[in-house]
Amino acid sequence: MSVYQATASAPVNIACIKYWGKRDTKLILPTNSSLSVTLDQDHLRSTTTARADPSFQKDRLWLNGTEDEIKDGGRLATCIKEMKALRKQLEDKDASLPKISSYSVHISSRNNFPTAAGLASSASGFAALVASLAALYKLPTSQSDLSRIARQGSGSACRSLFGGFVAWQMGELPDGSDSLAVEIAPREHWPDIHALICVVNDEKKGTSSTAGMQRTVETSPLLQHRIKHVVPARMAAISAAIRTRDFDAFARITMQDSNQFHAVALDTEPPIFYMNDVSRAIIALIVEYNRVAVEKTGKLKAAYTYDAGPNAVIYTPKEHIKEIVELIVKYFPQAENFKDPFGLFGAAGVQGKVVDGFNEAVSKPFGVGAVKGLIHTRVGDGPRTLGPEEALLSPDGLPK
């Protein structure tokens, strides 16, 4: 008997121009366009296996081995239903295709990083879900069209259907058909963009993004200014910076937009605080590092950005990443040795230090554990279809 199964992985993306606020909460249509960098799946990814079988009684999903309820009308159910509908269209056109759109599916998904740690697990998770179902159903659908479906699971998931540098175009139509992701440039266009993720807190956050952003839409006058007057110009400017590989402009816009996102969180009633003292100290370090860089070269060398949580992501060209790691480790000593995937430091490991001319008084040193971990990664590719040896379901259709 045929086994209808496919496995795919999808990447994490970290926004430079932030998505914050929905104009339609059911369809997940944003109040503004956004732009992100896709990170390397060799370091951060969600992997998902989907199987369709006539013996399955209902659609079921397991995340990191624990079953998650698929609520009727919920985001998971919506994505699965939309993907089944695309498969049914194929079957209706070609009588020779097996009618697997009518079968229930079992889906098993794993992240190789902590879920809800402020690393965008919902984005990579829903992108991997859509990618695995697209492979299972052998859909000829374009990535942009698939991104419309991923968007209905988690807004930022639509951006994880591409590698490199990705825009989520907010669209204008009320049905959301023009709210989708497009690639601004592939990974190969600017491969030397590296990222250092500073994991400040790997617990669940206090205010979820979904609840927080709608409170901002309802109460923040600053958000309305941002949507109308700030984001459109920044989207154009950062897209141009990416196309011309202008890191100075890319960094400046990325930091400005992170700052404004946290300003609209603060402008919300009651205010929302995602950053903590450690987050703010990392900003102070990068600002001072850049001050020295501008003095010497006239250009910025690093960009911080923060999503809805305290974790910092620092973008920098490959040639400067070593200095950035040394700087962070000097102020935030690590309990465990730095995992050095690119072999920057050799057997001796990383020693904390600052660059010449750096004013060390910009922040106090913190104790071990203030930054719980450092993840060094780089710009990466889009979803990958994996072989059966990487499947997460056993022959009985339950998680391995």
From Swiss-Prot:
Catalytic activity: (R)-5-diphosphomevalonate + ATP = isopentenyl diphosphate + ADP + phosphate + CO2
Keyword Transport attached: no
Start and end residues of each stretch annotated as Disordered: 381-400
Disulfide bonding pattern of the chain: none
Any single Gene Ontology cellular-component annotation: cytosol
Induction description: By methyl jasmonate (MeJA).
Involved pathway(s): Isoprenoid biosynthesis; isopentenyl diphosphate biosynthesis via mevalonate pathway; isopentenyl diphosphate from (R)-mevalonate: step 3/3
GO BP: any one term: isopentenyl diphosphate biosynthetic process, mevalonate pathway
Keywords: ATP-binding, Lipid biosynthesis, Lipid metabolism, Lyase, Nucleotide-binding, Steroid biosynthesis, Steroid metabolism, Sterol biosynthesis, Sterol metabolism
List of residues binding (R)-5-diphosphomevalonate: Y19, W20, G21, K22, R75, S154, G155, S156, A157, C158, R159, T210
GO molecular function, one term: ATP binding
Enzyme Commission number: 4.1.1.33
Family statement: Belongs to the diphosphomevalonate decarboxylase family.
Reported function: Diphosphomevalonate decarboxylase; part of the second module of ergosterol biosynthesis pathway that includes the middle steps of the pathway. The second module involves the formation of farnesyl diphosphate, which is also an important intermediate in the biosynthesis of ubiquinone, dolichol, heme and prenylated proteins. This module also plays a key role in the biosynthesis of triterpenes such as ganoderic acids (GA), a group of highly oxygenated lanostane-type triterpenoids which are well recognized as a main group of unique bioactive compounds in the medicinal mushroom Ganoderma lucidum.
Record-given protein name: Diphosphomevalonate decarboxylase
Source organism per UniProt: Ganoderma lucidum (Ling zhi medicinal fungus)
